[in-house]
Amino acid sequence: MFETQIEWNAPDGFPNLSKFKYIAMDLETKDPSLKSKGSGAIRKEGEIIGIAIAVNEGGFKWRGYYPIAHAAGNLDKKIVLDYVREICAYDNTKIFHNAMYDVSWLKSYGIPIKGKIADTMVMLSLIDENRLWFSLNSATWDYLKISKDEKILNESAAAQGVDPKSEMYKLPAMYVGQYAEADASLTLDLYYKLAQEIERQDLHRVLKLETDLFPCLVDMRFKGVRVDEEKAH
């Protein structure tokens, strides 16, 4: 019998984060053809199953995971998406790890992002172009000496016979919340650390170029490239 101790609960409210300069976000998704066809956000295949948010400024530290499409334990989808839309409308910096993926999913839901978008994965590539691994776990261990605790997620997935990552949507939110919140809070901590390294290496100009180009790259991904199938064959 599966008896892993669970202490996680979904947030009981929607805090006003409008005064924060930096907000980290991480999406959990159902994306069945990700490995074979790429992000389902572009093809409208799959869905967002939950959104994690984290802030840490001025002595106030908060993180929360809002589940909307898990097997059980979901919050009201419309209310959550309206809250996320409100946050994305703030004129501050939104931080992601692999922003192209998360921002594409938000765009597919009709949620635009105002303000600057920072991608810790891009920052990593600028700081160390010879780096082999760019996963959040790898980066947080190298720069923060912290790794995510995936015990509850992995044990619950094993007990229910599902893949803990690609089939996360099949798990009740209570088994995913802690893991998802850590994704957002560690992304934020990593950003603060990498920002110091960007400063030390004087990489501001090239980072600004990457950041300014990003919205255009997202739009290009959705528009695609016209292909003449007859000539292609």
Predicted regions and their residues:
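N-terminal accessory regions of nucleic-acid-interacting proteins
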Residues: 1-35, 80
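A short catalytic or substrate-binding loop motif that flags glycine-/basic-rich loops and adjacent residues
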Residues: 17, 42-45
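Structural beta-strand/beta-sheet cores of well-ordered domains, especially the beta-sheet scaffolds
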Residues: 21-25, 47-51, 92, 223-225
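Generic beta-strand/beta-sheet core signal
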Residues: 25-28, 54-56, 97-98, 223, ...
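Intrinsically disordered, low-complexity Ser/Thr- and acidic-rich flexible linkers and loops
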Residues: 36-42
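Active-site-proximal helix-loop-helix substrate-binding element of RNase H-like nuclease domains
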Residues: 44-199, 209, 217
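Extended, well-ordered alpha-helical scaffold/bundle regions in very large, multi-domain proteins
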Residues: 205-233
